[in-house]
Amino acid sequence: MTRNNLTTLAATIVLALLTGGCNTDDRAEGPEMPRFGDPLLAEGRSVWMGTCRACHLLGIAGAPAVTDYGNWAPRIAKGMRALYAGPINGIKGDDGKYKMPPRAGNDRLADAQIERAADYMIAAVEYLEEDARGN
């Protein structure tokens, strides 16, 4: 190995060691998401964790966070059909651009999977709100 190759290798190793702790998952943690015994909610949790969590855990990109109970109350009041329509069809802002892309940004999901994820998220929001109140 030449001196230049050794220098490059050493620099690469040092850089790898210095950046080893840099991980996109080192961001602030949200709440521990509940698990429910209902198999449909368990399926919904799996979809939610893989697709919806990125925005809805902490309220990224304008998405209502699961702990933003006041923001969820009017949405829940509209009923589940309305809650299903948003992630299936997408939600546009006043500027005409999608705030939430169609299919919740995951074209591989069937409508039923998106609906289960919405069911899970609403159950989780209600559970977390009760838990926060100490009930």
Predicted regions, residues:
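A short small-residue
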Residues: 28-30, 58-61, 96-103
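Gly/Gly-Pro-rich "capping" loops immediately C-terminal to redox-active cysteine motifs
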Residues: 57-85
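Bacterial signal peptide processing site
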Residues: 22-26
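Post-signal peptide N-terminal segment of mature Sec-exported envelope proteins
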Residues: 30-53, 73-74
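Sec-dependent bacterial lipoprotein signal peptides
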Residues: 1-20
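Axial heme c-ligation environment in periplasmic c-type cytochrome domains
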Residues: 65, 86-115, 121-124, 128-135
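Short N-proximal segments of mature Sec-exported proteins
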Residues: 46-57, 81-82, 86-89
